Swiss-Prot record:
Coiled coil: none annotated. GO terms for cellular component: plasma membrane. It comes from Pan troglodytes (Chimpanzee). The chain crosses the membrane at residues 691-711. Its main location: membrane. GO terms for molecular function: calcium ion binding. Residues 1-26 form the signal peptide. Residues 35-133, 138-242, 247-347, 352-451, 456-561, 568-671 form the Cadherin domain. Pfam families: Cadherin, Cadherin_2, Cadherin_C_2. This is Protocadherin beta-11.
Length: 797
């Protein structure tokens, strides 16, 4: 499986290679410019807008600029005029050496859309160098028997200029023995040969000298000179001869210094010193002399400087074998440099865009070029990025690539990407170059605020102070910057009757909720509303949450005594027969509390009594009963004060005062009589009062039944609009009783009244309350109405 994956990857790389080669062959049109070397920086080269047929403002709007593969900006583009100018002074000899023509390649990058234009700049040579002889003095040893027409090699002059500005001719100072003949070597260089015009005579002229002058073809021409000394030697009539007239050898460019490249060999038929051969490099350029060395005795050619295939691919060297008599032979050695994969690919970034918006696909992030100066497979390259990134590489002309987003990005998932661009050649071993870049993702408003809870429940005690902080809501936004800044607001309530604007307010910055006024549990137990969270993006996004506010009851209402009605001018009087048994029900104190829960749990106790121990009050229902048998010695009149107390904190209380009259029977009530009143008058008055009392009780019973029915119907019609309340759960103290119905002032209190006529004690019982909660004003009114039931004896019902 591993071999199969490797093979697949190799096939993909080969396909990408063919695509790149095809695109490079089908590149866009090339525009050529020409400029002479040594021109000052800022010199005009050409007008790009005119040549391309574009308007100058289009070059500016598309961000046109000049880029090059060698990372040196030798040209600059004036986007205001479209002129291409020199950024530096160009030296043709430094840039191209002996290569002619000297052409530099540039690209013009334009964006929106991305476009590459190929530019060739030809650097024209000027005659700024004079011919130079490496040796200012040459020594020639010529045998005297050299025939007329014999040719002798002279060292050639070096001129860094090319073309017509290179060395064109050689001359020598006038003499009668020699003239100059021009030759061209394999490197297309001209070199001089000295031709013998007149036989030499050692005895007549053992030595002669003349000036050798090299002239170039410039205008005006430049020249260089060297002194030639000719020493006439005696009879040496055999020249050295090489085994081969031409040698060819191939060596890798990474050969170590000092390694043996080739050994040349020559022989001379002469004997003695005339047969001794000396090997030298003839007409060698400076590069050859720096790179190679020949052993003068053995003919071994060794490497003295590193080779670089990318700089010079081959060398042609003339080896000269000279004997002691001055005769020589020559052979040509061609050294072919073999390329090795010693150069890693290079990446040149032309432009980069960061940050990029998160929701825009196919955005150009980077424009870059790649190259490998090796040759063959060593110079073929493939480019890749990790597959798990939402980016894609797209190739362009001349090894240019664009890095683009493959799909919309999500900043909330990944805020930045570290991208490694890997460029690998196909040499052995493979060399690669990695370029790391960080791309930041800018935020767009694509996330609405989110509340930490879908609903909030807040508890507020009633009677709170205005502007009280009752709670907070919180929302977060996954975006960043202003897109994540949240503003809070109150939304219009669904219930149009809810005065939300006067109840609560919200801090727009932090979501704190405040009660605007004091709340009353008895008026409003609970309410709910919705809050909104809106970010500051464009367009703004929002969300909402439900807030429920529950008002907690406080013990702010004292118990209210319903029965007996408290009227300072007409206190309640109860009749008790002296024959009553212990536990006889005298009356029942009925009270209510406007609060709820334990604040409405009431307990009763006898606070004061005329005769302690005679009467008792049941703590849980307020019933007043006799505690023992009555006797004739007990006083006829008794005043009882009953304390009604709730279970709040702190507790609130009320008192009920009632008068008890002990009588021998209901037919003979004991009442104080005027001293002159006759007995018959007492009987008549008692009968009248009993009739009035019976009528009052009957009317009160009938009125209670009607009131019960009316309250039932009213409660049923208002059940939907009345807010719910919480009722304390669990057991409560046995001495307490909740007489508040459902525990709220908005509920009605209902009492059923029953007078047991058949019992021995004729008890008057209140079984269940059935009257609405009475406010302060109503209390006085009810007291006035109930005062009509009193008679002259002080009885009331």
């Amino acid at each position: 499986m591993e071999n199969g994956g490797t093979r697949t990857q190799q096939i993909r790389q080969v396909l990408l290679l063919f695509v790149l080669l095809g695109m490079s062959q089908a590149g866009s049109e090339t525009w050529s410019f020409s400029v002479a070397e040594e021109m000052q920086s800022g010199s005009f080269v050409g007008n790009l807008a005119k040549d391309l047929g574009l308007k100058v403002r289009e070059l500016s709007s598309r961000g046109a600029r000049v880029v090059s593969n060698d990372k040196k900006q030798r040209l600059q583009l004036d986007i205001n005029t479209g002129d291409v100018l020199l950024s530096e002074t160009l030296d043709r000899e430094e840039l191209c050496g002996s290569i002619e023509p000297c052409v530099l390649h540039f690209q013009v990058l334009m964006q929106n859309p991305t476009q590459f234009l190929q530019i060739e700049l030809q650097v024209r040579d000027i005659n700024d160098h004079s011919p130079i002889f490496l040796e200012k003095q040459m020594l020639l040893e010529i045998p005297e028997n050299s025939p007329v027409g014999a040719v002798f090699l002279l060292e050639s002059a070096k001129d860094l200029d090319v073309g017509i500005n290179a060395v064109k001719s050689y001359t020598i100072s006038p003499n009668s023995h020699f003239h100059i003949k021009m030759r061209v070597n394999p490197d297309n260089r001209k070199y001089p040969e000295l031709v013998l015009d007149k036989a030499l005579d050692y005895e007549e002229l053992p030595e002669l000298s003349f000036i050798l002058t090299a002239l170039d073809g410039g205008s005006p021409p430049r020249s260089g000179t060297a002194l030639v000394r000719v020493v006439v030697v005696d009879i040496n009539d055999n020249s050295p001869e090489f085994e081969q007239a031409f040698y060819e050898v191939k060596i890798p460019e990474n050969s170590i210094l000092g390694s043996l490249i080739l050994t040349v060999s020559a022989w001379d038929l002469d004997s003695g010193t005339n047969g001794e051969i000396c090997y030298t490099l003839s007409h060698a350029s400076e590069d050859i002399r720096k790179t190679f060395e020949i052993n003068q005795k053995s003919g071994d050619i060794t490497l003295t400087a590193p080779l670089d295939f990318e700089t010079i691919e081959s060398y042609s060297i003339i080896i000269q074998a000279t004997d002691r008599g001055g005769l020589f032979g020559k052979s040509t050695v061609r050294i072919q440099v073999i390329d090795v994969n010693d150069n890693a690919p290079e990446i040149t970034v032309s432009s980069i865009t960061s940050p990029i918006p998160e929701n825009t696909p196919e955005t150009v992030v980077m424009v870059f070029s790649i190259q490998d100066i090796d040759s063959g497979d060593n110079g073929r390259i493939v480019c890749s990025i990790p597959e798990d990134l939402p980016f894609v590489l797209k190739s362009s002309v001349e090894n240019y690539y664009t890095l683009e987003t493959e799909r919309p990005l999500d900043r909330e998932s990944t805020a930045e990407y570290n991208i490694t661009i890997t460029v690998t050649d196909l040499g052995i071993p493979r060399l690669k170059t990695e370029h790391n870049t960080t791309v930041l993702v800018s935020d767009v408003n694509d996330n609405a605020p989110t509340f930490t809870q879908t609903s909030y429940t807040l508890f507020v005690s009633e009677n709170n102070s205005p502007a009280l902080h009752i709670g907070s809501v919180s929302a977060t936004d996954r975006d960043s910057g202003t897109n994540a800044q949240v503003n809070y607001s109150l939304l219009p309530p669904q219930d149009p009757h809810l005065p939300l604007a006067s109840l609560v307010s919200i801090n727009a910055d932090n979501g704190h909720l405040f009660a605007l006024r004091s709340l009353d549990y008895e008026a409003l137990q609970a309410f709910e509303f919705r809050v909104g969270a809106t970010d500051r993006g464009s367009p703004a996004l929002s969300s909402e949450a439900l807030v429920r506010v529950l008002v907690l009851d406080a013990n702010d209402n004292s118990p209210f005594v319903l029965y007996p009605l408290q009227n300072g001018s007409a206190p309640c009087t109860e009749l008790v027969p002296r024959a009553a048994e212990p536990g006889y029900l005298v009356t029942k104190v009925v009270a209510v509390d406007g609060d709820s829960g334990q604040n409405a749990w009431l307990s009763y106790q006898l606070l004061k009594a005329t005769e302690p121990g005679l009467f008792x009050v049941w703590a849980h229902n307020g019933e007043v009963r006799t505690a023992r048998l009555l006797s004739e010695r007990d006083a006829a009149k008794h005043r009882l004060v009953v304390l009604v107390k709730d279970n709040g904190e702190p507790p609130r209380s009320a008192t009920a005062t009632l008068h008890v009259l002990l009588v021998d029977g209901f037919s003979q009530p004991f009442l104080p009589l005027p001293e002159a009143a006759p007995a018959q008058a007492q009987t008549d008055f008692l009968t009248v009062y009993l009739v009035v009392a019976l009528a009052s009780v009957s009317s009160l019973f009938f009125f209670s039944v009607l009131l019960f029915v009316a309250v039932r119907l009213c409660r049923r019609s208002r059940a939907a609009s009345v807010g719910s309340c919480s009722v304390p759960k669990g057991p409560f103290p046995g001495h307490l009783v909740d007489v508040s119905g459902t525990g709220t002032l908005s509920q009605s209190y209902q009492y059923e009244v029953c007078l047991t006529g058949g019992s021995e004690t004729n008890e008057f019982k209140f079984l269940k309350p059935v009257i609405p909660n009475i406010q302060a004003k109503g209390l006085g009114k009810n007291s006035e109405e109930n005062s009509t039931f009193q008679n002259s004896f002080g009885f009331n019902f």
